[in-house]
Amino acid sequence: MKADHTQVTRLLKTARGQIDGILKMVEEDRYCLEVSSQIMAAQSILKKANRMVLKAHM
């Protein structure tokens, strides 16, 4: 079974966009809980992409 490259790529690009947004939030000295919330969202997307890749490996 191969990972759906399109879906994994989309997830990774979404995470990259979120991380870019997080960097901007940090530079703007935004409220720490807002930053933390966005970090957790990015982690969730990365975990999902990782699960897809690992599932395809099995």
Predicted regions, residues:
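Solvent-exposed interaction patches of small proteins and small membrane subunits
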Residues: 1-58
